[in-house]
């Protein structure tokens, strides 16, 4: 396997996180393209520095997003955005080194976040998550 830091994916992930995932400490997330994987169905992976290693190394949580170049690079721009959103969605609000599972990170929720992101880009805004939570809790 070959791993390369990807400045272009990093910029996209930073923009997405800044607009729709304010809990993500984007300076503690790095994006990589990988080449040479033998996996058949995986397009991307979210890796985390787990609690034990954080404690052993005396460092805070850190995430690495891996995009398998052979598959990811062939996708349309919109599909790439959805994959990046999907991987960012795995990062929990506590940003402690854990993961949200696929009960939460699913196609329906990815599509919703993608729509939110595209609306933010169109309107040059960020999402007010606190307002949205209050609104959801009232309904």
Describe the role of every protein-language-model region.
Residues 82-94:
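Active-site recognition of the HExxH zinc-binding catalytic motif
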Residues 1-78, 94-139:
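Metalloprotease/metallohydrolase-associated module, dominated by Zn2+-dependent proteases
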């Amino acid at each position: 396997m070959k791993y390369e830091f990807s400045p272009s994916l990093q910029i996209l992930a930073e923009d997405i996180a800044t607009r729709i995932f304010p809990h993500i400490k984007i300076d503690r997330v790095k994006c990589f393209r990988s080449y040479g994987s033998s996996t058949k169905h995986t397009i991307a992976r979210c890796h985390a520095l787990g609690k034990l290693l954080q404690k052993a190394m005396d460092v805070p949580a850190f995430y690495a997003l891996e995009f398998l170049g052979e598959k990811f690079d062939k996708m349309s721009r919109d599909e790439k955005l959805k994959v990046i959103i999907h991987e960012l969605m795995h990062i929990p609000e506590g940003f402690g080194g854990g993961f949200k599972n696929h009960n939460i990170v699913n196609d329906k929720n990815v599509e919703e976040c993608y729509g939110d992101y595209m609306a933010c880009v169109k309107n040059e805004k960020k999402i007010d998550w606190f307002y949205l939570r209050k609104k959801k809790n009232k309904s």
